[in-house]
Amino acid sequence: MSEAPQARRVGSVDDHSVYDDAKTYYTSEERHNNSRSGPRQRTYSQNSLLGQMERLGLKEPFRRGSHDESNHNRRFLIQVDPTLESLKSQEDTDGNMQITIEDNGPKVLTLRTAGSNGHNRFDIRGTYMLSNLLQELTLAQEYGRKQVILDEARLNENPVNRLSRLIRDHFWDALTRRIDASSIEVAAKDPKDWTDDPRPRIYVPKGAPEQLEYYKKLAADKPDIRLDVVELPETITPEYVVGINKAPGLLAVDMEETVDPKTGERVMSGRPFVVPGGRFNELYGWDSYMESLGLLVNDKVYLAKSMVLNFCFCIKHYGKILNATRSYYLCRSQPPFLTDMALRVYDKIRHEPDATEFLRTAILAAIKEYHSVWVAEPRLDPVTGLSRYRPEGTGVPPETEADHFLHILEPYYKKHNMTFKEFVEAYNFGRIREPELDKYFLHDRAVRESGHDTSYRLEGVCADLATVDLNTLLFKYETDIARTIRNVFGDKLVIPAEYCVGSLQPGQVETSAIWDRRSKRRKLAIDKYLWNEEAGMYFDYDTAKRQQCNYESCTTFWALWAGVASPKQAAIMVTRALPKFEAYGGLLSGTEESRGQIGLDRPNRQWDYPYGWAPQQMLAWTGLYRYSFTEEAERLAYKWLFMITKAFSDFNGVVVEKYDVTRPVDPHRVDAEYGNQGLGFKGVAKEGFGWVNASYIYGLQIINAHMRRALGTLTPYDTFIKALEDNRNRALSEMV
């Protein structure tokens, strides 16, 4: 893998960097004072005169401002508000506060150069530069600037460098939350709260008295935010969770003691975490692992470490890594990635004094989660020894839009002569029994726990499936735990009482041999029930029907990531399976044949063809690298990165949750049940989407330096590879 790219730092006025973050760039008075170019008043009067002439429909005599043909360190002297209005009225022809390839403006705007004190002019041309100008001026306006001196380098910046920089300097910060006094109003906001009074609320587990005291004091100190603080009972049942659905709230996560820089006093501070973005404003399970891959590349190690510790807190107090940290997710988990996440953080901090203790805590938490959640009833299938997504729970999932299940529930509420709301209330609290509906929601909850909500692969069967994804992840848990106990803890890990579940006893010693045996048993079961030699891929296994499924899913490549495939199986997968999933923009979630026909009665599902998701890409790249399929990993990474970069360049800096990897022009447009997160910004995108941000940063480590240069010039993969072949053939012919 190539080294992490560094943004080029170019000296500008007063030695500030051209590529400073927006806050630094736009709050510097010194940077935006045109003292080097002459008196400021003269510039204002000239621009004022020009504005009057333009409003009167008069043209300025050419002699007053010749075009600037120089191209070294060019900077523009811009009056923010009038220029922004001119830009929008001229170039944003569809009025959506974005400048894209779909707008029909002239695609050119003339700006005054700062070096000439506004006398000379220069044309800003093309969608990319104009949309960057819109973004920069939107930010300048938000920071209260009336006039700016804007570096041209921020407008024509290499798109790979620009997006990488925005992710590193802006998007991660915009997505970071702490559940404490500094930002609880932001962290508590829940776009999925459909109740009549969506006030901020936090649920604190029974065994966290310091947190309970902290939040009660916070509520008393800030009565205006109306924070409701609730202590959870010792035992949390599905019935209890249904009972609090009308009062949804955040779940407390870990806190740490820090020193207040102003007072020097020790205070409680929430451990930070990254949220996915859009309507997902809480700590999510597998999203966090994917995000950590990018955070670690960007040297945000403390943030990734904090997320691991937050997960350890969740396992200790809630019994599992939750789907997400909201009260309505208390019975539901998500795909388990804790061991790999913790080991990646440990590799970055192993020189720190508390590194070994950090890893010990994470591995102990993973062992507890493994035994209490994944290899216990109801998720364990005792016949195969494999595990399923099969969460507890009752009633209708409350986080969905109010009418999401309308078509499912309509026959039932009509049957009982009730309104939709009346029926949901009666069904949720067990006043009405409908076994078929119970079965439907059992599978629906399982789909949501899988993280693949929704897909025809899982619909109506998920709770019965021993899926490829879950069981390869558990194999990875088993091998990670074995290796860590052997290599870090001297082949002996003592289990403290707080981590004991099931048959585990306080003081019990875990050795690598125990976990090696578990992984070998799981591999045998995976090969027996999930591997299909003829198809050259892994399939889910239906534990109710006792047969292998035939839906072709991209999760087959998780076996490479986890290392459960033999070298022979890996080679067969690359030959037979990979061509079925590879598309213009990377890997498809599933094949078109497996998805089946789509129509009014059978709409698209977002985890099916033709959509591609960041987790599937990253796990496949890593898995292919693991088995030395470097060329394939680089090719897939390039396609994904090119698609993201092209959409970013053509559509005003857009970065979204998922993509249609079959659409070359507008892959961010998704026609599925939940739409797409990351689209609804005005002027400038400020957060992207968590795991797509990570996939971009991580993917740049996968491709080689030559590919990175081609990516910066927006060269499609086929064009890039043809140019390489032509150059190679030319070189060979010259040698003859």
From Swiss-Prot:
Transmembrane segments: none annotated. Substrate binds at residues 279, 286-287, 323, 332-334, 399, 448, 451. It is found in: Cytoplasm. Changing residue 394 to A: In strain: Guyane 11. It holds the Pfam family Trehalase. GO terms for biological process: ascospore formation; trehalose catabolic process. It catalyses: alpha,alpha-trehalose + H2O = alpha-D-glucose + beta-D-glucose. The keyword Metal-binding applies. It is an enzyme of class 3 (hydrolase). Ca(2+) binds at residues 92, 94, 96, 98, 103. PROSITE patterns: TREHALASE_1, TREHALASE_2. InterPro entries: 6-hairpin_glycosidase_sf (IPR008928), 6hp_glycosidase-like_sf (IPR012341), Glyco_hydro_37 (IPR001661), Glyco_hydro_37_CS (IPR018232), Trehalase_Ca-bd (IPR011120). It comes from the Eukaryota. Its EC number is 3.2.1.28. Its main location: cytoplasm. Induction: During sporulation, plant infection and in response to hyperosmotic stress. Residues 1-47 are annotated as: Disordered. The active site is at 453 (proton donor/acceptor), 657 (proton donor/acceptor). Keywords: Calcium, Cytoplasm, Glycosidase, Hydrolase, Metal-binding, Stress response. One of its GO terms (cellular component) is alpha,alpha-trehalose-phosphate synthase complex (UDP-forming). Its cofactor is Ca(2+). GO terms for molecular function: alpha,alpha-trehalase activity; calcium ion binding. Belongs to the glycosyl hydrolase 37 family. Hydrolyzes intracellular trehalose to glucose. Plays a role in pathogenicity, specifically in proliferation of invasive hyphae in rice blast disease. This is Cytosolic neutral trehalase. The gene is NTH1.
